[in-house]
């Protein structure tokens, strides 16, 4: 099962229904054809920022925070990037100290088919392209989305 597709369905169900908790949502996901374990759902909640709020009638309702404005988020992440370099097989992004994880997470959440994955240290992100034949275009794509020269 695709994580992005599952999280999209979770967002849709929580936004369009009065869902009181994880067990209720697990049942709704099952009816939609998604078999999800409770620990996986808990991790999705943490990643997506889903919280359980008390309603006026004393019950509970899950809520999803608004999506951050993409341009603002890109600008903030872009300010953390010091340089982007590449060789024949990979792309390296140097960041401010302690900010590599945030930059790597941002790139992972874009779900670009051009990026196989990222590995982040303290101030360096290793970007693994889906194919080494497109290193130059992937580097340009990353520079564009992070507003880097």
Curated annotation (Swiss-Prot):
Supply one GO BP term.
protein complex oligomerization
Cellular localisation: Cytoplasm
Q: What start and end residues bound the annotated signal peptide?
A: none
Which is a Pfam family this sequence falls into?
Arg_repressor_C
What's the domain of life for this entry? Bacteria
Q: Which UniProt keywords apply?
A: Amino-acid biosynthesis, Arginine biosynthesis, Cytoplasm, DNA-binding, Repressor, Transcription, Transcription regulation
Which cellular component appears as one GO term in the record?
Answer: cytoplasm
Q: Where are the transmembrane segments?
A: none
GO molecular function annotations of the record: arginine binding; DNA binding; DNA-binding transcription factor activity
Pathway assigned to this chain's UniProt record = Amino-acid biosynthesis; L-arginine biosynthesis [regulation]
As for what it does, the entry says:
Regulates arginine biosynthesis genes.
Which family, according to the similarity comment? Belongs to the ArgR family.
The protein, known as: Arginine repressor
